[in-house]
Amino acid sequence: MKDLMFILPYQAGTLAQLTGALSEAGVSLQGCSGQQFGPEGIIHLLVDNAAEAREAAARAGFVVRGEHEVIVADIEDRPGALAGLLAPLANAGINVSLTYLATRSRLVIGVDDVDQAWAALRATGR
């Protein structure tokens, strides 16, 4: 899966315009994270079709500022689940650059080496 990052003006309706444009193009959003920094917001969207999402965003006047392949791992809704999921990555010396929850109790994880991270997680049965 791909995480697309956008920097949007912190104005009412901007995120609705972006997500509406993606919806009209048939792009399914599997996860979303955002935070305001001064006059702007940084938005991360987990999409099922990055190429179509980029094109739809561009048609609506939005620019993708970052695109990363990410891990989307199932995570239980219980105390310690996040620590247990991240521990194999830490033990393998993998830096985590991004996390947010996605649909259906899944965690999006941004790392420098996706293959190495998957190997570390799979070694623990994930």
Label each PLM-derived region with a short phrase.
Residues 1-126:
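A conserved regulatory-domain signal marking ACT and ACT-like small-molecule sensing domains
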